[in-house]
Amino acid sequence: MQVTETQKEGLKRAYTITVTAAELDAKVQEKLVEAQPDIEMKGFRKGKVPLAMLKKQFGPRLLGDAMQDAIDGAMRDHLETSGDRPAMQPEVRMVDGETWKEGTDVVVEMKYEALPEIPEIETSKVSLERLVVKADEAAIEEALKNLAESAQNFEDRRKGSKAKDGDQVVIDFKGSVDGELFEGGSAEDYPLVLGSGSFIPGFEEQLVGTKVDDEVTVKVTFPAEYGAKHLAGKEAEFACTVKAVKAPKAAELDDELAKKYGAEDLAALKGQISERLEAEYKGASRAVLKRALLDQLDQMVSFELPSKLVEAEAHQIAHQLWHEEHPEEHGHNHGNIEPTDEHKALAERRVRLGLLLAEIGRKAEVTVTDAEMTQAVLAQARQYPGQERAYFEFVQKNPQIQQQLRAPIFEDKVVDLILEGATVTEKEVGKDDLQKAIEALDEM
């Protein structure tokens, strides 16, 4: 077996691998010997079939396996000897693959880009500022007010009052299409909050300004994508009778409100809110700190990037951003999306930082534990109520999904490792300053 270098330019590598006919035949023979003890043929006891007969019957079937094993072995030996780590799966092409005949040498061309040598960074030279926000009384009171509004009740307005946006009207209604009542289109004593958007578009607006005992005919058109296909896109009329008009009234900020949210009393609820707010502030502060760290790391290192990795990342960025701008398009029938120079620059940054963090993690032997993976899967599974088990099984069968869940955990652990050696000072700021810092991340 021979491996000949044909290209070594920057990170690009190309080799010709030659497996001689004799080596390939020996590999086939080896596989036949391995299989012989388990094979039975008429006229022979199990394991006693002559190799010549086995080769005649099974040789062609084993030839492909032997060829693959030989090539894989040559590639593996080459990578171990050279120390190269391919940035992506090597491209492998069999020379004369269409015309190759048994008894001749197998010649394969292998191409790949090697991962670059990545310089070590001195974490002690990294200097960062961590924003610290305390949950003050004003923020807690604001959160309490929002909870009270969420738990609001409705009280009857004075007789003759007109319904306003945000009011609750209690109505009887009967819906019809082309003069015929349709199933599920009628109800009595139905409480509807105007402006909630819970009914067909245009329905609630026509009830603003109505009073108790008013009879109103609401005319709407069902959306084209409406769930009930027989109603989709159809014009409909709803005969409505207004039975009550109620104004919203926020719940009182007292122990009863606290109990609604699972707290023992109002003081305990305030404590829970304070903890939740500070956890939110801490998460936001970490996002700002992490971006600042990545910005510094990006300026500290410079090395050649595998062009194929950058190209793949740029296309992924372009594709993702296109779909964000065209949310109505869910498939891939949109033609080719060419990355812009901005996409390519962002791709270079992501690849550079990704390789740097991966190398730091590799050298420090950073790993993602089974427990951490389980927590990540559980967090994702909660997005599919009632289908958690199915999601677990889906993840178990999909290494790509596992890697998507593992990657951010690994990255965060490497970030923590770098922060341990960096100089990080704390700066206490208000929540508005933190919010501005978060908003600035989206603009970059």
Curated annotation (Swiss-Prot):
Keywords: Cell cycle, Cell division, Chaperone, Cytoplasm, Isomerase, Rotamase. It is an enzyme of class 5 (isomerase). Its EC number is 5.2.1.8. Belongs to the FKBP-type PPIase family. Tig subfamily. This is Trigger factor. HAMAP family: Trigger_factor_Tig (MF_00303). NCBIfam families: tig (TIGR00115). Consists of 3 domains; the N-terminus binds the ribosome, the middle domain has PPIase activity, while the C-terminus has intrinsic chaperone activity on its own. GO terms for biological process: cell division; protein folding; protein transport. Pfam families: FKBP_C (PF00254), Trigger_C (PF05698), Trigger_N (PF05697). Transmembrane segments: none annotated. The lineage of its organism: Bacteria, Pseudomonadati, Pseudomonadota, Alphaproteobacteria, Rhodobacterales. It comes from the Bacteria. It catalyses: [protein]-peptidylproline (omega=180) = [protein]-peptidylproline (omega=0). Residues 166-251 form the PPIase FKBP-type domain. InterPro entries: PPIase_dom_sf (IPR046357), PPIase_FKBP_dom (IPR001179), Trig_fac (IPR005215), Trigger_fac_C (IPR008880), Trigger_fac_C_sf (IPR037041), Trigger_fac_ribosome-bd_bac (IPR008881), Trigger_fac_ribosome-bd_sf (IPR036611), Trigger_fact/SurA_dom_sf (IPR027304). Its main location: cytoplasm. Involved in protein export. Acts as a chaperone by maintaining the newly synthesized protein in an open conformation. Functions as a peptidyl-prolyl cis-trans isomerase.
